[in-house]
Curated annotation (Swiss-Prot):
Name used for this protein in its record: Bacilliredoxin BLi02578/BL01507
PANTHER family: BACILLIREDOXIN BRXB, UPF0403 PROTEIN YQIW-RELATED
Biological source species: Bacillus licheniformis (strain ATCC 14580 / DSM 13 / JCM 2505 / CCUG 7422 / NBRC 12200 / NCIMB 9375 / NCTC 10341 / NRRL NRS-1264 / Gibson 46)
Gene3D superfamilies linked to this entry: Glutaredoxin
Stated family: Belongs to the bacilliredoxin family.
GO biological process: cell redox homeostasis
Any single Pfam family the record assigns to this protein: Disulph_isomer
Length: 145
């Protein structure tokens, strides 16, 4: 049974990775990739991915649809909590003042945290509510494309 569970979880993780990269987010798997991506000029949205139900049912759909907006971040990236542990830990170092949370979204500008949408603002909400929250941040902090 353990072998079946591992195969199942590998499929869940693979699908979760594919969903977010298909939405245009660049996957960061190492601390070095995180540093390179999060210190770029401009605004960066980080989606902290996970395998929980609220990630698949709410956060990833919101990540996909929120960026179809007049104003949006310059860069879209993702780290995977529980999978790419070192990359996720490094990303969280940039989220100063916020506790670890997954799934979650962090909006940064020039490597500095602006705002986060934490798990408690995702879990139990409809995807549209999270999309609206993200687009509100884009409206406030991002440039029109």
């Amino acid at each position: 049974m353990n072998m079946d569970f591992n195969l199942f979880m590998n499929d869940v993780v693979r699908q979760a990775r594919q969903e977010i990269t298909a939405a245009g987010y660049t996957e960061l798997k190492t601390p070095e990739e995180v540093d390179e991506a999060l210190t770029k000029k401009g605004t960066t949205l980080v989606m902290v991915n996970s395998v929980c139900g609220c990630a698949g049912g709410i956060a990833r759909p919101a990540a996909h649809h929120a960026v179809h907006y007049d104003k949006r971040p310059d860069h879209l990236v993702t780290v995977f909590a529980g999978q790419d542990k070192e990359a996720t830990a490094r990303a969280r170092e940039y989220f100063e003042g916020y506790p670890p949370s997954s799934p979650s979204f962090a909006l940064l500008k020039d490597g500095k945290i602006l705002k986060m949408v934490e798990r408690h603002e995702i879990e139990g909400y409809e995807p549209m509510a999270v999309i609206t929250k993200l687009q509100g941040l884009f409206e406030e902090y991002c440039e029109e494309v």
